[in-house]
């Protein structure tokens, strides 16, 4: 898996979030009912709830894990009286979150992106003060370059993988901490099913770890990928961790397009009732446009992939729907605009 960031044994999420000098960089995102989506499930008498991580300060859920990891890396560097330099490869959203963390923590940051990332996304990352390097056509190639750069710069201990690190997963699991508290406080009911998108698997690991923490392993999970970014779906079909050929990575949704989920994602998934589903790029883009009309929240197609399962009512064919409380993770994303979505929709086959 390449270089790993070394974290001292005494590091823990509780210590970090309770330290005045290292506050978390994410917010508690709102849990909202979507009346528009609930209306689609009127016959089933079901409500659709949204965990809206699109409202995170970096634009996506990624800041949960990235903020935790960056805070800890900086703490480690300060203890050695050394200067930190965060280096991260990304399909866009992890890079934006690392750049945001670097700006807030006053740390030099370099983000390596593949050449398929929109210029608008690159500019947003630069606006956070990060140095941006464009290399390769897919994330895997950008990641190889980032690892080499970290070696060259002598800062391998500040290399940040976008989805494969225990502190990233721990940070992402705070999403479930908040959902559990919302249930305890009567904001919503315990979910009967949870839907979310899968790229490299970091968010999935965090969500499943959080569910495990509260004994919610009984909740069915629906994971969503697009055709052409379907590494977890393929692993599930073949009953082993599988890597896509480069020629199979054809989705235009680059923030989902990794050749394989990380090994921990595959291992932890075995302990849960998971139903992977594939949608088309067009489904995902179309869902983004519907969602911005319905909820006035703009998300990118990696998030729209999951929303499309609700808009198309494919969920009803996946479950024996006693699911009265459907929860979808609105994970967000920075790499789009309404104009881009409309333009992209015109290029995708019907």
Curated annotation (Swiss-Prot):
Keyword Ion transport: yes or no? no
Tell me its EC number(s), please: 4.3.1.17
Pathway in which this enzyme or protein is active: Carbohydrate biosynthesis; gluconeogenesis
Q: Which cofactor does it need?
A: pyridoxal 5'-phosphate
Please provide the record's keywords in A-Z order: Cytoplasm, Gluconeogenesis, Lyase, Pyridoxal phosphate
For the modification N6-(pyridoxal phosphate)lysine, the affected residues are 62
Where is this protein localized, as stated in its record?
Cytoplasm
Q: What are the GO BP annotations of this UniProt entry? A: gluconeogenesis; L-serine catabolic process
Q: Name one GO cellular component term.
A: cytoplasm
InterPro entries for this protein = Ser/Thr_Dehydratase, Ser/Thr_deHydtase_PyrdxlP-BS, TrpB-like_PALP, TrpB-like_PALP_sf
At the top level, the lineage of the source is Eukaryota
Task: Write the signal peptide boundaries.
Answer: none
A molecular-function term among this protein's GO annotations: L-serine ammonia-lyase activity
- What catalytic activity does the UniProt entry give for this protein? L-serine = pyruvate + NH4(+)
Class of this enzyme: lyase
**What CDD domains is this protein classified in?**
L-Ser-dehyd
Which Gene3D superfamilies would you find in this protein's record? Answer: 3.40.50.1100
PANTHER family tied to this protein: CATABOLIC L-SERINE_THREONINE DEHYDRATASE, THREONINE DEHYDRATASE, MITOCHONDRIAL-RELATED
Provide the family line.
Answer: Belongs to the serine/threonine dehydratase family.
* Name this polypeptide is given: L-serine dehydratase
């Amino acid at each position: 898996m390449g270089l790993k960031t070394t974290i001292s044994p005494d590091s823990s999420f509780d210590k970090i979030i309770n330290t005045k000098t290292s506050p978390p960089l994410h917010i508690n995102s709102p849990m909202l009912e979507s009346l528009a989506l609930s209306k689609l499930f009127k016959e089933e008498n079901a409500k659709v709830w949204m965990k809206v991580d699109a409202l995170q300060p970096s634009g996506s859920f990624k800041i949960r894990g990235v903020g935790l990891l960056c805070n800890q890396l900086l703490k480690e560097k300060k203890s050695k009286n050394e200067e930190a330099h965060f280096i991260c490869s990304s399909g866009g959203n992890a890079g934006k979150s690392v750049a945001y963390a670097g700006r807030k923590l006053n740390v030099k940051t370099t983000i390596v992106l593949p050449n398929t990332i929109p210029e608008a996304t690159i500019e947003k990352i630069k606006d956070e003060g990060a140095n941006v390097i464009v290399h390769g056509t897919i994330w895997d190639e950008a990641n190889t370059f980032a690892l080499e750069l970290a070696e060259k710069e002598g800062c391998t201990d500040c290399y940040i993988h976008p989805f494969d690190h225990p502190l990233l997963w721990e940070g992402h699991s705070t999403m479930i901490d908040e959902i559990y508290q919302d249930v305890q406080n009567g904001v919503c009911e315990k979910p009967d099913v949870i839907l979310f998108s899968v790229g490299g698997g970091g968010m999935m690991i965090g969500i499943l770890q959080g569910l495990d923490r509260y004994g919610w392993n009984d909740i069915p999970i629906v994971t969503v990928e697009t055709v052409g970014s379907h590494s977890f779906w393929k692993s599930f079909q073949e009953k082993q961790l599988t890597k896509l050929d480069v020629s199979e990575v054809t989705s235009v949704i680059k923030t989902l397009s990794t050749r394989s989920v990380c090994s921990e994602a595959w291992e932890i998934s075995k302990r849960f009732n998971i139903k992977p589903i594939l949608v088309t790029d067009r489904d995902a883009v179309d869902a983004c446009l519907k969602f911005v009309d319905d909820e006035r929240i703009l998300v990118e197609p990696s998030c729209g992939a999951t929303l499309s399962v609700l808009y198309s009512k494919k969920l009803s064919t996946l479950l024996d729907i006693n699911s009265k409380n459907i929860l979808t993770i609105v994970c967000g994303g920075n790499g789009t605009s309404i104009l881009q979505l409309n333009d992209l929709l015109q290029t995708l086959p019907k």
